[in-house]
């Protein structure tokens, strides 16, 4: 035994050693990388040479041997006035000998990572890198002292080997980038880089947040970039130690230690731990609670093993005896005549009682009797009908019906015959409806369908409407075709032609579109502008918010962040903390604990820096600790308000105090002390030293020159001026020309700090450190430049679906309806006001109550008297008037025999792929079958056990409104739900999410008059998003998109309220799309231009036809001879206009024509006298010409028969008359004597 105990001891010590090593692991590292050191003269800080005080150069430098330089680093707490002595409280380090008087090292990069890795393993690290580990929360402020030393193997005291000492007090945050520091000391110039990095598995600005991924007994999680724990699949809880059990497992009676299990508690059993274990030895009983034995019918006793119906279970009496149950497990037999015995087994006159049934003959035998049975019967008393169906005589699946001395086969439709052995000709009944022909098959038939039809009997019209109609057109399915009914403004076979430029709804966010000839115009609502109303106007200038609320611009709207005491759109309505007195049990500083823990639990509403004091009316007040203020004591009082730091010092606000970070050249609590740079003697006793700000000046003795009086020849050397300054030797002194950004006698003072302009936002304080900066953020902000608001709502502090409002260093819980309290932990008891009347019982529910009415009363408050009405029947069940029930996802109510149900399409029923056929939940309705879900429908595994009941045809009506499509119109809205995958329950599918949305009361309320369709699918924008397409059916008479918009927003409002649904609690963002983006109209350019050109071409044709007809009429008129006028004014023009008398006319000689032309030229028409009449027929006076002119003035409206005649009136000299056209008119107005034919005219011309 002793040997065994000593054997265990080394292992225990080894375990303790491992734990100690683990406990001493650092939280982070301070890293310093030396880049360069320049000691031009090879001197020590005392002025002596490194290896003796002999000077060999003419300039006075040390030339016999160079220094063996190495560096020591001391890291300690922040000191306003740096003291080089004292312990290095944060750590220290040193380098090996790096070089001589001056040397350069490679720049810092991955060297720190490599050195840190080698330092852990004990390997060699980069010589110029110093790594100081720390095992405490990094305070961000520090003091760094860097010393350069000369290595000497002799016994020279250390202080005499110091080359240079520089110091830096500042702030630095953990990050990967390096910060550069430059120091110009009395003797040497140093360049180095520093940074702080957290060790692996440590996070935050102080490296004290530990998170190491693990998958063991203590947790199952990974770590994100901020050190937060992210549970692995199948695990939950703060430490991710709680396993997610099998879906359906009764957690009251079981649990699990491995994800997906369901391990039952003591006394429970079954797949889901929902079956109790009965009392041991229970024979004929069951249990409701563990270790009970509830007997079945006819059984009794402690173990239910006593037969209370022995006669019914054993039938002991024979020969027709009647069995009587006497006691448990006891019986008596009442024997018929002729039988005796306990069981009536002995016969005296066996056949006396006619024991043989069904015509059997009885014969007495020594043991009793025997029955000779007729055909078809069997048994001791011929009471058993011989089962002729036992041999399965019916073929082809026929059903056998046993009969007396025979059987009958009930055959399937495809078979006939006595035993269903003949194939029936199913085509005789003409089952095919829309087919070319019917073909009889063995056990069935086949229909050769016409084009456009399908199905077993060709009874299904193939839907040709899938995705045919564009721009929201309604597709009408035809036989082997389709027809698109286009909305207003569109046309074409597929509604692809846009007539109305507003039909595509180009105006966004509620803008009203006006169609113009060359485009459209959007009339934007208040707060919007732009061509498509896409530009937000600043609705917060001036601010509409009252009572000090802050205004935020939203998309087309604004939001007022109201204080606690006010609400409403503009924060103008005072809030009532306890409306209606319903929350009288609520304490302003906490909540009332349950019966098991009496008292009031604190809510933490005042945060870690305040004490809550309850006030009347459920209000509270926060008494803040010193240094804090605000409603929730969340604001740290700014102690830097009065700018206490002097000389450009940076003030850092702390709790009830402040700290000054001084620039180079100043120190002290308020940066009001200029350290003496003349200590120790930088002039090496060769001159007088004068102290400056962050510098010094040496007035050298005769014979010495230089900044430190180190040379006898030159005032300038390569390092007299710092930071790239140029040195000019002026004989007795020197002058430095500093580069941009630096000033001072030797260019040691920076003009522009790295904090100008201030890169830190949200009240952060910038602390410059060389060429970089660090931001000290106010409480509630974090990040390199204080841009990230710390999430005060993580972990979730609000219970029961309350929404956490994250502020700056505070949070507030906005409770779901029915809950109240600082953290929404209290369920408001709506039954406190006794709302139920007439003796009804009030049952408190979440955000409401339910009244259990006495007989004869109904209604929400039992205020209605029940009147005899007709019940409603649904699925074989009767429901009384006024009652409500659920049918799938719809709610129904009975109104005097009429079922009033919501119209929501409930989708496909889930089914268990691995379920037994006897399980009702795993079976599909008739005509449907359980199929696996489509790939990608699982939102949170495992989902492989569940499928969907799918029919041959899709259940929802055909609609173009589908998820993952760009279709939006007056009857289509699209919702995009984003989920926090860590909060989604295991086994959740897209179908389960869709079913949950369909079951919302807001969804059922919207589906009152039309069928509401909600179709879901995974969104293409992300793995944790689901798209929901919302539409109505039918949608033919929808005037606008108001119905679909109100429905979509009602569903979104119900989702954001969340309630107690664990699935809706995981929703982090909801996006609503109800307006189609304005599309390009270039596709309509060609049809529009064609239409314009067609109109222009038609107009040209009409004008050409009109012009041609006009010219034709003018030519016809020019061919007609004109009548003589009263004064012969047309005579001179007659040879020109009369075609009959033109040169070369028919029948006219050349000479005759000249004479006529000569006479016409010398003819002067006399003036017409009043009342002179032309020669005409008797009885015609001056009125004849007027009548003729009147006839001429009628134009072409007279009878066309007048065109058949040519009327001429001649003067005395007919050769000079000018023909005028005359119109034919009936009556005496026509002078037939003046009418001549063309032949007469030609004859007259020859004469």
UniProtKB/Swiss-Prot annotation:
Entry's Gene Ontology cellular component terms: membrane; plasma membrane
Basic and acidic residues bias spans: 1115-1125, 1192-1212, 1230-1247
Residues on Extracellular side: 24-1082
Domain EGF-like residues, every copy: 241-274, 275-305, 307-345, 347-383, 385-421, 423-459, 461-496, 498-534, 536-572, 574-634, 636-672, 674-710, 712-748, 751-787, 789-825, 827-863
Highest classification ranks of the organism: Eukaryota, Metazoa, Chordata, Craniata, Vertebrata
Localization, UniProt: Membrane
Domain DSL: 196-240
Post-translational modification Phosphoserine, affected residues: 1125
Tissue specificity of this protein: Found to be highest in fetal thymus, epidermis, foregut dorsal root ganglia and inner ear. In 2-weeK-old mice, abundant in heart, lung, thymus, skeletal muscle, brain and testis. Expression overlaps partially with Notch1 expression.
S-S pairs: 198-207, 211-223, 231-240, 245-256, 249-262, 264-273, 276-287, 282-293, 295-304, 311-323, 317-333, 335-344, 351-362, 356-371, 373-382, 389-400, 394-409, 411-420, 427-438, 432-447, 449-458, 465-475, 469-484, 486-495, 502-513, 507-522, 524-533, 540-551, 545-560, 562-571, 589-612, 606-622, 624-633, 640-651, 645-660, 662-671, 678-689, 683-698, 700-709, 716-727, 721-736, 738-747, 755-766, 760-775, 777-786, 793-804, 798-813, 815-824, 831-842, 836-851, 853-862
Keywords of the record: Calcium, Developmental protein, Disulfide bond, EGF-like domain, Glycoprotein, Membrane, Notch signaling pathway, Phosphoprotein, Repeat, Signal, Transmembrane, Transmembrane helix
Keyword Heme: no
UniProt protein name: Protein jagged-2
UniProt xrefs under PANTHER family: CYTOCHROME C OXIDASE POLYPEPTIDE VIC-2, DELTA-LIKE PROTEIN
Organism of origin: Mus musculus (Mouse)
């Amino acid at each position: 035994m002793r040997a065994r105990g000593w054997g265990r001891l080394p292992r225990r010590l080894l375990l303790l050693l491992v734990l100690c090593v683990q406990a001493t692991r650092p939280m982070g590292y301070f890293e310093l990388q030396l880049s360069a050191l320049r000691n031009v003269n090879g001197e020590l800080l005392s002025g002596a040479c490194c290896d003796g005080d002999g000077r060999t150069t003419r300039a006075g430098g040390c030339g016999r041997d160079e220094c063996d330089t190495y560096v020591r680093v001391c890291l300690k707490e922040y000191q306003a006035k740096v003291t080089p002595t004292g312990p290095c409280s944060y750590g220290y380090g040193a380098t090996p000998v790096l070089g001589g008087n001056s040397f350069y090292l490679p720049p810092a990069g991955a060297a720190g990572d490599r050195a840190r890795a080698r330092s852990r393993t004990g390997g060699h690290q980069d010589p110029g890198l110093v790594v100081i580990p720390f095992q405490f929360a990094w305070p961000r402020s520090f003091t760094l002292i860097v010393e350069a030393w000369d290595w000497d193997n002799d016994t020279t005291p250390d202080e005499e080997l110091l080359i240079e000492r520089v110091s830096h007090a500042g702030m630095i945050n953990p990050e990967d980038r390096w910060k550069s520091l430059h120091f110009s000391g009395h003797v040497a110039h140093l360049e180095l880089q520093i940074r702080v990095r957290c060790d692996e598995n440590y996070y935050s600005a102080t490296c004290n947040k530990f998170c190491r991924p693990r998958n063991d007994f203590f947790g199952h999680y990974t770590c994100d970039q901020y050190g937060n724990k992210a549970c692995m699949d199948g695990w939950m809880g703060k430490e991710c130690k709680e396993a997610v059990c099998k879906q359906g497992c009764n957690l009251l009676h079981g649990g699990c230690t491995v994800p997906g299990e369901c391990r039952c508690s003591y006394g429970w059993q079954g797949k889901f731990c929902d079956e109790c274990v009965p009392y041991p030895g229970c024979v004929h009983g069951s249990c409701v609670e563990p270790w009970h034995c509830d007997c079945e019918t006819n059984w009794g006793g402690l173990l239910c093993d006593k037969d209370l119906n022995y006669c019914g279970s054993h039938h002991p009496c024979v020969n027709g005896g009647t069995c009587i149950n006497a006691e448990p497990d006891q019986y008596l037999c009442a024997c018929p005549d002729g039988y005796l015995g306990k069981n009536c087994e002995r016969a005296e006159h066996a056949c006396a009682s006619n024991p043989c049934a069904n015509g059997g003959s009885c014969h007495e035998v020594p043991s009793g009797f025997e029955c000779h049975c007729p055909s078809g019967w069997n048994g001791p008393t011929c009471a058993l009908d011989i089962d002729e169906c036992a041999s399965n005589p019916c073929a082809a699946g026929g059903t056998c019906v046993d009969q007396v001395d025979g059987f009958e086969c009930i055959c399937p439709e495809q078979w006939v015959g006595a035993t269903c052995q003949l194939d029936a000709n199913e085509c005789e009944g003409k089952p095919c409806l829309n087919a070319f022909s019917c073909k009889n098959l063995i056990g069935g038939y086949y229909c050769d369908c016409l084009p456009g039809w399908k199905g077993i009997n060709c009874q299904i019209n193939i839907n040709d409407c899938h995705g045919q109609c564009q721009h929201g057109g309604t597709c009408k399915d035809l036989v082997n075709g389709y027809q698109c009914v286009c909305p207003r403004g569109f046309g074409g076979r597929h509604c692809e032609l846009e007539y109305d430029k507003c039909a595509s709804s180009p105006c966004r966010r509620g803008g009203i579109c006006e169609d113009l000839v060359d485009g459209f115009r959007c009339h934007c609502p208040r707060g919007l502008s732009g061509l498509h109303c896409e530009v937000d106007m600043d609705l917060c200038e001036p601010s509409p918010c009252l009572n000090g609320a802050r205004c935020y611009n939203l998309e087309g709207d604004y939001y007022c962040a109201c204080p606690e005491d006010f609400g409403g759109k503009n924060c103008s309505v005072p809030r009532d903390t306890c409306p209606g007195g319903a929350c009288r049990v609520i304490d302003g500083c906490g909540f009332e604990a349950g019966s098991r823990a009496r008292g009031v639990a604190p809510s933490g509403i005042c945060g870690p820096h305040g004490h809550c004091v309850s006030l009347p009316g459920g209000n509270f007040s926060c008494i803040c600790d010193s240094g804090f203020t605000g409603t929730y004591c969340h604001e740290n009082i700014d102690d830097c308000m009065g700018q206490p730091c002097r000389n450009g010092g940076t003030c850092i606000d702390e709790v009830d105090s402040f700290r000054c970070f001084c620039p180079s050249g100043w120190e002290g609590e308020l940066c009001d002390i200029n350290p003496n740079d003349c200590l120790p003697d930088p002039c090496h006793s060769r001159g007088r030293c004068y102290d400056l700000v962050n510098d010094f000046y040496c007035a050298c003795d005769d014979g010495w020159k230089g900044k430190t009086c180190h040379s006898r020849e030159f005032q300038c050397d390569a390092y007299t001026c710092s930071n790239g300054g140029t040195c000019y030797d002026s004989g007795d002194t020197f002058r430095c020309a500093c580069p941009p950004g630096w000033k001072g006698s030797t260019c040691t003072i920076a003009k522009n700090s790295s904090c100008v302009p201030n890169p830190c936002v949200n009240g952060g304080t910038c602390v410059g450190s060389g060429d970089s900066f660090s931001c000290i953020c106010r409480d509630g902000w974090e990040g390199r430049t204080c841009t990230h608001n710390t999430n005060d709502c993580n972990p979730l502090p609000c219970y029961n679906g309350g929404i956490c409002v994250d502020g700056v260093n505070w949070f507030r819980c906005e409770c779901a309806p029915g809950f109240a309290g600082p953290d929404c932990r209290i369920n408001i008891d709506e039954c406190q006001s006794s709302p139920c009347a007439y003796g009804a019982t009030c049952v408190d529910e979440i955000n409401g109550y339910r009244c259990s009415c006495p007989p004869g009363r109904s209604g929400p408050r039992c205020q209605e008297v029940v009147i005899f009405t007709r019940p409603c029947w649904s699925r074989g069940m009767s429901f009384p008037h006024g009652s409500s029930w659920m049918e799938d996802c719809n709610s129904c109510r009975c109104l005097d025999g009429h079922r009033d149900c919501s119209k929501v399409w409930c989708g496909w029923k889930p089914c268990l792929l691995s379920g037994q056929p006897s399980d009702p939940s795993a079976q599909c309705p008739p005509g449907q079958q359980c199929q696996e879900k489509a790939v990608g429908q699982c939102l949170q595994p495992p989902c492989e056990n569940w499928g969907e009941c799918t029919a041959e045809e899709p259940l929802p009506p055909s609609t173009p409104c589908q998820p993952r499509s760009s279709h939006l119109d007056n009857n289509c809205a699209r919702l995009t739900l984003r989920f926090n995958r860590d909060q989604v329950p295991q086994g959740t599918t897209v179908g389960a999410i869709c079913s949950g949305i369909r079951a919302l009361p807001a969804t059922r309320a919207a589906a009152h008059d039309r069928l509401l369709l909600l179709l879901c699918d995974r969104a293409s924008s992300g793995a944790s998003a689901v798209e929901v397409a919302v539409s109505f059916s039918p949608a033919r008479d929808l005037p606008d998109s108001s119905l679909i918009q109100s429905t979509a927003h009602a569903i979104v409002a119900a989702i954001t309220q969340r309630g107690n649904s664990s699935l809706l609690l995981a929703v982090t963002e909801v996006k609503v799309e109800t307006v189609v983006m304005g599309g390009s109209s270039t596709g309509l350019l060609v049809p529009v231009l064609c239409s314009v050109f067609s109109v222009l071409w038609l107009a040209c044709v009409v004008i050409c036809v009109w012009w041609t007809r006009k010219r034709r009429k003018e030519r016809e008129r020019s061919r007609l001879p004109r009548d003589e006028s009263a004064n012969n004014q047309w005579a001179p023009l007659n040879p020109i206009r009369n075609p009959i008398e033109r040169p070369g006319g028919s029948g006219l000689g050349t000479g005759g024509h000249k004479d006529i032309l000569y006479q016409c030229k010398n003819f002067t028409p006399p003036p017409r006298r009043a009342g002179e009449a032309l020669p005409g027929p008797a009885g015609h006076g001056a009125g004849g010409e007027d009548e003729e002119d009147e006839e001429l003035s009628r134009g072409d409206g007279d009878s066309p028969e007048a065109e058949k005649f040519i009327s001429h009136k001649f003067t005395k000299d007919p050769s000079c008359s000018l023909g005028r056209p005359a119109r034919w008119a009936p009556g005496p107005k026509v002078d037939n004597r003046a009418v001549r034919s063309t032949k007469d005219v030609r004859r007259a011309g020859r004469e």
